[in-house]
């Protein structure tokens, strides 16, 4: 397995609170890796550290076998892009202006905007279906369109690795699938390494080549969804009882949570008669 990213005995902390403790992780190159886990388990913290947005307390993070702490910022930005959760664009910024920001790592005092930069921006707009919205204000877009605009910016950055923190947050079901399908296509057609945090376990199973379940500051399980996602994992990681079935469309694990819902309401109403 070729590794795009790797951590060695990585410990991450906020103040004196340890979030991730001596974690060893390998991110496969050219695959979609999705972090899952309960709220507060450290998924987003881990993702931020991979992007060098959070300095490790101890341990190493390797990008193509080189410690990222020793690399220049622009050098990293030419190899890895990150889309944080809920990014906000300045008022009045157009889609085209936003996407152009993805070319910042390639700008210098001597080398300003080039034909290559323009080509990468136009290709990014086309790949995300945003060409027709290029002159539209980012704030005038729907949720799904706005997220596609941000993804276009990361594509314009032209990196082999894209990190995304909960890219479907605040999106309705249609736009969630739209964004995840786009990321899937980028991985399939361009072999980009995609690493993201998702809350929806069923969508994670559907789109991931590689699932990383995080619990108690460590990796609970890692591997293909069909190999690692079972009722015990859901019970241990999410503290929830469920039934694992098979997605009838994709053949991936399908988590059906235990709960009350309408059936229980009907049973209670019947018992009260």
Swiss-Prot record:
The UniProt entry lists the main location of this chain as membrane
Effect of inactivating the gene: A mutant lacking fatE, fpuC and fpuD ATPases is deficient in petrobactin import in iron-depleted conditions.
Where does the source fall among the domains of life? Bacteria
- Keyword vocabulary terms for this entry: ATP-binding, Cell membrane, Ion transport, Iron, Iron transport, Membrane, Nucleotide-binding, Translocase, Transport
All residue ranges annotated as the ABC transporter domain in the record: 5-241
State its location(s).
Cell membrane
Keyword ATP-binding in record = yes
Query: Its topology with respect to the membrane?
Result: Peripheral membrane protein
Gene3D superfamilies for the chain: P-loop containing nucleotide triphosphate hydrolases (3.40.50.300)
UniProt xrefs under SUPFAM superfamilies: P-loop containing nucleoside triphosphate hydrolases
Q: What biological-process GO terms show up in the record?
A: iron ion transport
State what this protein does.
Part of an ABC transporter complex involved in ferric-petrobactin uptake. Probably responsible for energy coupling to the transport system.
| Protein family | Belongs to the ABC transporter superfamily.
Q: How does it assemble?
A: The complex is composed of two ATP-binding proteins (FpuD), two transmembrane proteins (FpuB) and a solute-binding protein (FpuA).
Q: What is this protein called?
A: Petrobactin import ATP-binding protein FpuD
Originating organism: Bacillus anthracis
The uppermost taxa in this organism's lineage are:
Bacteria, Bacillati, Bacillota, Bacilli, Bacillales
